[in-house]
């Protein structure tokens, strides 16, 4: 789970979806059904349940990462909102899915997983023949390069980007005051990371080569929130980074993730 969620245990559970489960066909965001979690067994029995279940909220950066992967892989799934404002993530039912009381958690048949990056890699490997090839199964060198940039995202980019998004975006949502000194420090750190990205993207269209991979996808949630802030200049001032962001943000799968936030 990302730094934003770690610091915001009540991270945005939209009231409009608090008591509902969404069934999605990843081919179209307009093709989904809503059933109340309180509905009777007779009414719910008419709904075909997806084998993949995601427990989370669409505004969560970590949940967004998993949802984007599901859409890229063209997989049907069921999104089960977790009412974090009511403390559902700390209740026994959710702790059985994620003992740390965080989101998201994923169920695929009899398999239960937590930690968003572990979930996305599982989906990319397990469903390698479906949808986009997010991890190369043919070339060990490409796969190794993808793994390098997956680590870079998790160890270098996200710790700074997520904390910066917390300062720039989420503090305001929760009536907290942005710390200008923290913003300055985090932007300084992120600039150095993005300088490395600029050099890398001068050599290849995407981080792991000429194809979109999980390494690119993992960046989308934090970037999405920062693009709406003054920190956008960090990306815009680097031509290759800016071009890369435009490409990955324009993917249909990502548009569906953003649409979910409006449901």
Swiss-Prot record:
GO terms for cellular component: chloroplast; chloroplast envelope; chloroplast stroma; cytosol; nucleus; plant-type vacuole; stromule; thylakoid. It comes from Arabidopsis thaliana (Mouse-ear cress). Isoform 1 is predominantly expressed in leaves and isoform 2 in roots. The modification Phosphothreonine is found at residue 177. Residues 1-49 form a transit peptide. It catalyses: RX + glutathione = an S-substituted glutathione + a halide anion + H(+). Induction: By salicylic acid, ethylene, methyl jasmonate, auxin, H(2)O(2), metolachlor, and the pathogen Hyaloperonospora parasitica. Residues 50-131 form the GST N-terminal domain. Keywords: Chloroplast, Cytoplasm, Detoxification, Oxidoreductase, Peroxidase, Phosphoprotein, Plastid, Stress response, Transferase, Transit peptide. InterPro entries: Glutathione-S-Trfase_C-like, Glutathione-S-Trfase_C_sf, Glutathione_S-Trfase_N, GST_C, GST_Phi_C, Thioredoxin-like_sf. Residues 139-263 form the GST C-terminal domain. One of its GO terms (biological process) is defense response. It holds the Pfam family GST_C. This is Glutathione S-transferase F8, chloroplastic. It is found in: Plastid, Chloroplast; Cytoplasm, Cytosol. GO terms for molecular function: glutathione binding; glutathione transferase activity; peroxidase activity; salicylic acid binding. Glutathione binds at residues 60-61, 89-90, 102-103, 115-116. In vitro, possesses glutathione S-transferase activity toward 1-chloro-2,4-dinitrobenzene (CDNB) and glutathione peroxidase activity toward cumene hydroperoxide and linoleic acid-13-hydroperoxide. May be involved in the conjugation of reduced glutathione to a wide number of exogenous and endogenous hydrophobic electrophiles and have a detoxification role against certain herbicides. Belongs to the GST superfamily. Phi family. Its EC number is 2.5.1.18. PANTHER family: GLUTATHIONE S-TRANSFERASE F8, CHLOROPLASTIC (PTHR43900:SF44), GLUTATHIONE S-TRANSFERASE RHO (PTHR43900).
């Amino acid at each position: 789970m990302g730094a934003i969620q770690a610091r915001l245990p009540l991270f945005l559970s939209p009231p409009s979806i608090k008591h509902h489960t969404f069934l999605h066909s990843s081919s179209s965001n307009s093709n989904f059904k809503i059933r109340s979690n309180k509905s009777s067994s007779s009414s719910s029995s008419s709904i075909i349940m997806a084998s993949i279940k995601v427990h989370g909220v669409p505004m969560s950066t970590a949940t967004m990462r998993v949802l984007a992967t599901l859409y890229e892989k063209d997989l049907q799934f069921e999104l089960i909102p977790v009412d974090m404002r009511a403390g559902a993530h700390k209740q026994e039912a959710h702790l059985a899915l994620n003992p740390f009381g965080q989101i998201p958690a994923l169920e695929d048949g009899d398999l239960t997983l937590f930690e968003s990056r572990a979930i996305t890699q599982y989906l990319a490997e397990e469903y390698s023949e479906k949808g986009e090839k997010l991890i190369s199964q043919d070339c060990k060198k490409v796969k190794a390069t993808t793994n390098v940039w997956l680590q870079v995202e998790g160890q270098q980019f996200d710790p700074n980007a997520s904390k910066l998004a917390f300062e720039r975006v989420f503090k305001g949502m929760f009536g907290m005051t942005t710390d200008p000194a923290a913003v300055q420090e985090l932007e300084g750190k992120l600039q150095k990371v993005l300088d490395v990205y600029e050099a890398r993207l001068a050599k290849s269209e995407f981080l792991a080569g000429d194809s979109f991979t999980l390494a690119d996808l993992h960046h989308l949630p934090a970037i999405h929130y920062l693009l709406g802030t003054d920190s956008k200049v960090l990306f815009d001032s680097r031509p290759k980074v800016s071009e890369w962001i435009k490409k990955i943000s324009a993917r249909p799968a990502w548009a569906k993730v953003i649409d979910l936030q409006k449901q």
